[in-house]
Structure formats: structure tokens, C-alpha cells
Design a protein with these regions (language model features):
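Multi-pass alpha-helical transporter architecture, strongest
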Residues: 77-86, 271-293
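Cytoplasmic helix-loop-helix junction between adjacent transmembrane helices
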Residues: 4-39
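Helix-loop-helix hairpin linking two adjacent transmembrane segments in secondary transporters
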Residues: 28-29, 33-87
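C-terminal transmembrane helical hairpin of 12-TM major facilitator-type secondary transporters
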Residues: 171-218
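Intracellular juxtamembrane helix-capping segments at the cytosolic ends
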Residues: 13-26, 212-226
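A late C-terminal transmembrane helix in Major Facilitator Superfamily
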Residues: 227-261
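Interfacial helix-cap and linker-helix signal at transmembrane-aqueous boundaries
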Residues: 54-60, 134-135, 167-168, 253-261, ...
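Extracytoplasmic gate region of multi-pass secondary transporters
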Residues: 106-159
Length: 293
């Protein structure tokens, strides 16, 4: 348990720091760069699922400690790379960032926090249960379920972020995010209401594609709306997102358990998160227009 807590803290710090590091880089299209950055989270998840599943298939789950030692190579490589990477400041020379108390007094900040919570919940409410859904729906082993469920979700989510990262200058971020929310709602309905297992599994993959832009897109919107937010802003948004990542799957689990393990009903309940995110985006758009006027 202490080891889990320590690596969770380490992973959280990387998540908090790497987004503002990229935001400070002198790139032309920061929204695209942010999306491209977060696509590598998906490729990492895909690689971990694929390689870990392969390892367990070859050597058995009893050798999990050896696998943990092998994965130590990744944070070690990150440690070395971080010593080489030039880090720019988020603020102009002579400009200071906001304190937490200043940030808390900005009204749009709380809207962005709610949007991040919904983004995290929309993503993980399906992702965390994708393997179980595949196992129960298709009656397959856990090994195959891990490959078919979470890995397919991660690949499609990464593809969505890669597309925006490559062609972001051709898209309007606001419209892209709103369209993704609508697609996410459709995928939730497909998973929970269509009684054909393979269709539900396709819905899981579509959900992965739809949630791809939600997290990095909200980061980009926040950075543009709160210029002096700095690392504190990214840290608070990451906190809200992580709360959503925990709360979304928990809600699905509670509802499913209350209705005799009905996972479809649990996922249907979680549809509230992409709906609320869409409402938040519409409200955010009105606030931005009002401030410009």
C-alpha cells in the first residue's frame, strides 16, 4: 500500500508539471501541442496493457514483482530526460503568477474545475469498466478482456488526440469539444441500451475516441482564459480531473451493485457527466463572449 501511494504521488506530480512545461514552450498552436502531449498518455496505457498482458501470459501472474522492476525503467528514463529538457517560464519577465486565494476568486475557474471533473469522470466511467464489460458481454477470459476493452479504448482516445494534435489549426476547439460531448453521450447510450454485446463493445471504443479532447481541451481553455494561472491553475485542474477519474467509476460501481451487478445501468447513470460537460462548455462560451463585449 505505501508503494502504491508513493507512485501515485509521483505520477500526480508528473501530470501536474508536464502540462505547464509544454504550455510555456514557444509553440505556434498550443492547443494542438497540448492534445499531442496527452495522446502519449494513451500510447503509454496501451503499451502497459499489451506488454503486461503478454508478460503474464508467458510467465504467469506469480512473477508480477519482476514486471514491476521492469517498469521501473520508465520513471528512471524520465528522470534522466528531465535533467536535459530546457524549461521555460509560463509568465512574462517581471510578471508573477496567481496565488491560490487569487485563483479561487476568479469565477470562471470554478466552472473550469467542474468541467475537468466531468472530463475525468466521462473518460474513466467507461475505461475502468471496459474489461469487465468485455468479459461479461462476450464471455471471454480476463486476458482477452483486457486487450479488447481498455486497450481498444486507449487506442481510440489516443487517435482522437493525435488527430487534433496534427490538424488542430483546422478545427475550432470549442466546436470539437462540444461535438465530442455529443458523441460521448451517443456512445454511452449505445453501451447501456443496445442489448448486442459486440455493439456495446464498439460503443466503448467510440467513447474512447469521444473523450480524447476533453482533458487537454479544458487545459487549453483554462490557460487562455486565466493568463496568470500558472502551475497552480494546472495543479488544481489536475486535482479536479483526478477526482472525476475516481468518482465516475465509483458511481458506475455503486449503481451496478445496487441493481444486481447491472453494469449497463451503472454506465447509463454516468451519462450525466458528458451532459454536464456540454452544459459547462456552452456556459463557458457565453462567459468568454460577455467578457470580450
Amino acid at each position: 500500500m505505501p508503494a502504491v501511494m508513493v507512485y501515485a504521488i509521483g505520477g500526480g506530480l508528473i501530470e501536474v508539471l508536464i502540462s505547464p512545461i509544454l504550455e510555456a514552450c514557444p509553440t505556434d498552436n498550443k492547443e494542438s501541442a497540448m492534445s499531442l502531449l496527452h495522446s502519449f498518455y494513451c500510447w503509454g496505457c496501451t503499451g502497459v496493457v499489451l506488454l503486461s498482458t503478454l508478460f503474464f501470459a508467458l510467465f504467469g501472474t506469480s512473477h508480477w514483482k519482476i514486471l514491476a522492476l521492469i517498469w521501473v525503467l520508465l520513471p528512471t528514463a524520465n528522470l534522466i530526460l528531465f535533467t536535459k529538457v530546457p524549461i521555460y517560464s509560463l509568465h512574462e519577465e517581471g510578471e508573477s503568477g496567481m496565488s491560490i486565494s487569487e485563483l479561487f476568486r476568479v469565477k470562471v475557474f470554478w466552472l473550469l474545475m467542474a468541467m475537468m471533473l466531468c472530463a475525468g469522470a466521462s473518460e474513466q466511467a467507461v475505461s475502468q469498466w471496459a474489461s469487465t464489460f468485455a468479459e461479461k458481454g462476450l464471455h471471454i477470459q480476463k486476458t482477452v478482456g483486457d486487450l479488447v476493452g481498455p486497450m481498444m479504448f486507449s487506442v481510440l482516445m489516443g487517435l482522437s488526440r493525435l488527430i487534433y494534435g496534427k490538424y488542430g489549426e483546422k478545427f475550432n476547439l470549442d466546436r470539437f469539444m462540444k461535438g465530442s460531448c455529443v458523441l460521448c453521450v451517443a456512445s454511452y447510450l449505445c453501451i447501456s441500451l443496445v442489448p448486442v454485446p459486440i455493439v456495446g463493445l464498439i460503443g466503448c471504443a467510440i467513447c474512447g475516441f469521444s473523450v480524447g479532447i476533453m482533458w487537454p481541451g479544458t487545459f487549453s481553455k483554462a490557460s487562455a482564459a486565466i493568463k496568470r494561472g500558472g502551475t497552480v491553475l494546472f495543479a488544481m485542474l489536475a486535482l479536479a480531473g483526478d477526482l472525476g477519474c475516481s468518482g465516475g467509476p465509483t458511481l458506475v460501481g455503486f449503481v451496478s451493485s445496487a441493481f444486481s451487478g447491472n453494469l449497463r445501468l451503472g454506465i447509463l447513470t454516468a451519462i450525466v457527466f458528458p451532459v454536464l460537460l456540454l452544459a459547462g462548455l456552452c456556459t463557458f462560451s457565453r462567459l468568454v463572449v460577455k467578457n470580450v463585449d
